Amino acid sequence: MPLEAVVYPQDPFGYLSNCKDFMFHDLYSQEEFVAQDTKNNIDKLGHEQSFVEQGKEDDHQWRDYHQYPLLIPSLGEELGLTAIDVESHPPPQHRRKRRRTRNCKNKEEIENQRMTHIAVERNRRKQMNEYLAVLRSLMPSSYAQRGDQASIVGGAINYVKELEHILQSMEPKRTRTHDPKGDKTSTSSLVGPFTDFFSFPQYSTKSSSDVPESSSSPAEIEVTVAESHANIKIMTKKKPRQLLKLITSLQSLRLTLLHLNVTTLHNSILYSISVRVEEGSQLNTVDDIATALNQTIRRIQEET
């Protein structure tokens, strides 16, 4: 756009006055501009410094502290402001580091407790295995054919019961008495310990005269069962080849012979037998075993 010159009439007497007014007006406007510019710069500096301080607080949580340069050095020099030295204000230690240290200690304590528990349990199992090995060595191998804990403990129980039976069967020999002549043995003193040997027999001989002989049992029979093992006590009259026939009958009943003890007193004989009930056997209870043995003893005595 072309500039056009505009000519104003001038008062010959007011030229100096107008020039003076223009000069004062120009100085006043320049002072207002400088003041406004200074105020704007101060506000801008305060806003930038607050933004820098907020950024520093956020960065303190995740990174190390370093010296930051002054963002607006020229403006700070003009306004007489100084830069904030970050190194003069060391940051406080953050709680997250302490928490991590405490968590590491807790993990170490938990790991130590776990290792201690494992060591105690290992020692307990080792001691239990040693005791089971000693217990298994004290009894015949037929009582504990398997090496597990239940078999060893069950076999030990059966072996202790068998030893008790053997001890009771040896009592008649210890308490044997003789008549005054010394050549004969009292029959009553020998039979008495045999009768005391049976606690709860399933079959018993009838001594009363009013009971028919056919209804009485030919032997005293008592059976006890522990799991798959059975302890049998039989007291009867001695017969030839009776023991061989009894063992054969036990095998036919699927009763495996584990231990046998025989005690004789004059015309009587006491069998202490330990057997194992095999799988597939029809004898599942003490009454079944006692009934089968009663029939076997009756048949043996009738054959002889």
UniProtKB/Swiss-Prot annotation:
Pfam families xrefs: bHLH-TF_ACT-like_plant, HLH
Tissue expression summary: Expressed constitutively in roots, leaves, stems, and flowers.
This protein's record includes keyword Protein biosynthesis: no
Origin superkingdom: Eukaryota
Chief place of localization: nucleus
Keywords of this entry: DNA-binding, Nucleus, Transcription, Transcription regulation
CDD domains from the UniProt entry: bHLH_AtFAMA_like (cd11448)
Biased composition (Basic residues): 92-104
GO CC annotations on file: nucleus
Residues covered by the bHLH domain: 112-163
GO process annotations (BP): regulation of DNA-templated transcription
Region annotation Disordered: where it falls in the sequence: 86-107
Assembly and interaction partners: Homodimer.
Name this protein carries in UniProt: Transcription factor bHLH94
Organism: Arabidopsis thaliana (Mouse-ear cress)
Gene of this entry: BHLH94
